Structures are given as C-alpha cells and as structure tokens.
C-alpha cells in the first residue's frame, strides 16, 4: 500500500478526480491512501477588514528583494510537512520508505520509470504543491526535498501535477489495475483505435475502419498496430 500525503491550499480540488474510476477503487480496496494537509491549518490567525470578524489564516507574503506576486511562507508549510511525517512514521519505522517531493517546473523529469521506482521503493510519498509565485526556498533546505517536474511548463498550482503523480504511481501498485488496464499500461505509445460503426458518415464523407482490423487475422492485426503506433 502506498500512502500519499498532499500539502496543498486547495484539497477540495482533488475530490472529483480521486473519487472516480481506478483511483476510487484503489482507495476502497486499500491499495492506496490519500491524505491532505492544508498549510492554513498551521498558520496563526489574523483579522482583515474585508472579512470583518472572520479569522484570516495568512500563508503568503511579499517576496524579499521585490518582484511580482506573493510567496507562500515557510512556517505553515513546514508544520504541515511535519504533521505528514509524524503520520507516516507511525506506520513505518524505516525512514527510507518515506519520500518528500517538491513540485517544480525545473525539477527532475517525472516519467513512467520514476513512477515505477517510487511504487517499488516507498510506502509514503509527501507531495508539496506550490501556489502564487512559489514557496519560500527554505522549506526545501529544511527537508532536503527532491524537486520533480511533470513537464517543461508552468501551472497555476502544483495540484494538477500532484494528481498526475498519484495516478501514475498508483497504476504501478500491484492489484490496482485489472488485466485490461495492465495491457494498456505496457504501451509507451498507442496505435490508432476504432470501434463501431464500421462506416462513419460525416458531412457526406465516409470514414471506414481499416480492413485489416475486420479480417480476423490476428498476426496481420498485430503487425498493423505495430506500424501505426503514435
């Protein structure tokens, strides 16, 4: 079983994706578990006029040295990670089974091999999701995190990247995928696929399924698929 500990300001953004299909089943069958830690829960409350008497849990501030936007403060994130580590250590005495990931577009490239290794080596993966202009860099220094990127692009926050990691790593956990899904998982790339109807008519033009796929000749079909991988 793999436990994902997600440090995020927006835990509700995960609900729909984790509550459906393979990941929902994996959680129900206790193949994986996902727990959230909101840095706001570890921040000291202040009051701002815009919210009258409601406490405002601040987790960001202006960057030192100037620049646009706001930066997530270190202490609320540190405390959230500490809580995640405490929960992880209750379940495993081997610290080598715990991994802390700091999501960053400049980090190590996440891929299928990374997902496989993570599923094999770790029982607890703590994923830190940034927002705004980023997180105070001292968080990385304190915990000696591993910077990981899901691609050479910038996202509004780390939540989407975290979902990608959860999905990909979970698929490598034994028992999460069925036979059909396992077949899909072995493909680095996939050929074109077709289903009924055999002839699709769109704007008076006919689009037909390749004849080889209708032939019943499994060897020919396999050769066709190998030649049409994209």
Regions found by a protein language model. Give the residues of each.
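Hydrophobic/aromatic beta-strand patches that form the interior of the parallel beta-sheet core
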Residues: 5-7, 35-37, 101, 125-126, ...
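Structured adenosyl-cofactor binding patch, chiefly the S-adenosyl-L-methionine
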Residues: 135, 139-182
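Internal, active-site/partner-interface "lid" segment
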Residues: 160, 172-211
């Amino acid at each position: 079983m793999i436990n994902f500990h997600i440090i995020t300001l927006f835990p509700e953004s995960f609900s729909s994706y984790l509550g459906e299909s393979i990941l929902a089943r994996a959680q129900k069958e206790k193949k994986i578990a996902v727990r959230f830690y909101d840095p706001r829960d570890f921040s000291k409350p202040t009051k701002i006029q815009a919210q009258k008497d409601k406490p405002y849990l601040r987790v960001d501030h202006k960057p030192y040295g100037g620049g646009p936007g706001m930066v997530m403060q270190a202490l609320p994130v540190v405390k959230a990670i500490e809580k995640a580590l405490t929960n992880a250590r209750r379940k495993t005495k081997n610290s080598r089974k715990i991994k802390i990931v700091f999501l960053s577009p400049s980090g190590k490239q996440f891929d299928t091999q990374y997902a496989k290794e993570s599923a094999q080596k770790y029982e607890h993966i703590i994923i830190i999701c940034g927002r705004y202009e980023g997180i105070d860099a001292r968080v990385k220094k304190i915990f000696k995190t591993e910077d990981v990127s899901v691609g050479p692009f910038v996202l509004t926050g780390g939540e989407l990247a975290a979902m990608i990691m959860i999905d990909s790593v979970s698929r490598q956990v034994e028992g999460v995928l069925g036979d059909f899904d396992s077949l899909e998982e072995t493909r680095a790339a996939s050929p074109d696929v077709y289903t009924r109807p055999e002839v699709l008519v769109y704007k008076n033009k006919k689009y037909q399924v390749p004849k080889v796929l209708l032939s019943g000749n499994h060897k020919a079909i396999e050769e066709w698929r190998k030649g049409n991988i994209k």
